[in-house]
Amino acid sequence: MKHVGFTKFLDFTAQTGSAKAASALAAFYQSGNMQNSRTHYYENLREALITAERSGKYTDWEDFIREQKEEAQEATRDALIKFYKWKSNYVSAAWYEPPKQIWALQEFDVNINPELGLILDGEVHAIKLYINNKKLSDLKAQAAGLIMENMFHEQYPSIKFAILDVKAEKFHVFNGASERLDYLLIGEAAHMSAILSAAKQRAVA
């Protein structure tokens, strides 16, 4: 069983043509390889923000910025400013541990893992952090919300599911989607399964 990241699956849903196949094949060859020498700055920042919000102990962000590669320091500072600007829109923000679950499909599974569990002004949110430099389209934002809704709503009916596009300063709270998007996600999951199955067969041929 191959393991595909939540964000990588969202990228796959929005791609077309050869880029779509390349995305699935990258998942095939990278699955299970936890040693990634090309860790991007936003992955470090994501983990630091989760730790800070969970503990309530805010780090010295200037020290954190200086620890990043020089070419990533400006982008890291910009993302931090935008994150805390967004958070300042709320009078209160309390942490809770957000739900997580594996979405098991035919040839792969996806770790559905909203990183931030925040009670914002009394409303419980499970939030997927998006700090990537790639544009977050409305389709990907809706798809993320629908996947989380499908996975968690029955057990956690009071939670609002959202994706925070830090760079664009947009907070996408899922408020429902058309039946067509549900069918689209089923089709995209089947499409990725078909590509991964073909890659597996070719690898053993």
Where are these regions (language model features)?
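Flexible, glycine/threonine-enriched loop-and-boundary segments that flank and lead into catalytic domains
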Residues: 99-105
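Well-ordered, non-membrane alpha-helical segments in soluble/globular domains
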Residues: 44-45, 140-148, 185-192
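Acidic-basic catalytic patches of nuclease active cores, encompassing PD-(D/E)XK
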Residues: 67-98
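A structured, charge-rich N-terminal accessory region that forms the first stable segment of a protein
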Residues: 1-72
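Short beta-strand-loop-alpha-helix junction that forms the active-site gateway
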Residues: 129-138
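Active-site beta-strand-loop-beta-strand hairpin of nuclease catalytic cores
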Residues: 107-126
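Metal-dependent nuclease catalytic regions and adjoining charged, substrate-binding loops involved
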Residues: 153-205
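Compact mixed alphabeta submodule
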Residues: 138-139, 153
